[in-house]
Amino acid sequence: MLLSVASSGCMGLAMQRELMEGMRDDPREEIVPVEPIVQAHIFAQNECILPGTESYSQETDCYSNESVILVDETVSKMLLDFSVSFEWSSTVGEFLGNNTDELRFVEITLLKPNGDKCWEYLATSSVGQMALELRSESDCTISIGNSSGFTNGNWVLQVRARGYALSAPIDTLSFEDEFRVSLWVTKKCIVFPEIHSDGECTFSSELE
């Protein structure tokens, strides 16, 4: 009698375990964005010296920086967006001619791990929000590569810029040149319903 009850209890636990296993949702794959790298700058008064003046001794770009983003085989897209604000850029261009890229500019370059250029853009006037989407290296505009994905390794975002600011007694004459550049990738991410809350997942590259 005792043996029968014990056996029945063990069978009950096994059946409950199987039932619970059957009720679990299967893991699912999602494509999610990775935290972007951002380069943003607001120029201060006298930060960049106007070329041609007596005190001018700067390089052409008084802002220069680069950021690295790691790309692996799980990356499905690379996305970049940027904006540039140059007050009175059209007026300055008409007054000084077409060489305003020596005075005010933002140059954005995306480099592959081997140093080849994938994409670049030169802004010499204000630019509203613009975006670039790369689904593979075949979408590069300079050095086209792998059509089925991206080369693994460190991709580099380079930004060079020159801008100005003026704090005038009359507010309408004051201005601050500025820009913002963001680069990020989307990657495969696995959701395990039994351990992840809403919005959570584990990147597949971390499971390998």
What does each model-identified segment do?
Residues 19-57, 200-205:
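Glycan-recognition and processing domains
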Residues 53-127:
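Acidic, Ser/Thr/Pro-rich low-complexity intrinsically disordered segments
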Residues 1-28:
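Secretory targeting signatures
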Residues 16, 25-31, 110-112, 146-208:
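C-terminal edge strands of extracellular/lumenal beta-sandwich accessory domains
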